[in-house]
Amino acid sequence: DLGENIRIGDGKCAIMAGPCSIENEEQVEKTVAFLRAQGVRMMRGGVFKPRSSPYAFRGSGIDGLKMFANSCRKAGIKIITEVMQVEQIDQMYEYVDIFQVGARNALNFNLLDALGKTDKPVLLKRGMSGTIEELLSAAEYVFSNGNEQIILCERGIRTYEKAYRNTLDLNAVPILKEKSHLPVVVDP
């Protein structure tokens, strides 16, 4: 329960939308206005971006997060963004409603332990080649440290196909629901 009648896991469709990365104020303002007009109450966007290439844009950082939070708060939209390091949790805490653990950090056990000691929901994305059991184990790291507000995310896995980045494993969704009481979301 994120407050303001926003819930995940209550059987209703919860839409979380937004850009891959938070780049500038104009982008955020336009996206916030569009999402709000559609009735979407949760916006995701990366301010720290783990990239395959060291030359790619790696995010707008804490300043981008502050701007992102300011725009979303004014519109009553909750914020989801990726945390990549334990040290970032305290910096980000007041601006984030849901901490996201991305695929590249799915097995970062120090980060999972630290997020387990917070009182904010944690969205766990399945690792790039992660198994269902590894995703559930990641959730256990958070859970065993006291935080039961965990959302599992099927985001696709790496396969031999190169036409698209990830292959969505829809079979994982009912299996995760069968093996766990935690809410499951899909990031196509």
Where do the PLM segments sit?
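Active-site mouth loops of central-metabolism enzymes
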Residues: 13-30, 54-59, 78-82, 102-103, ...
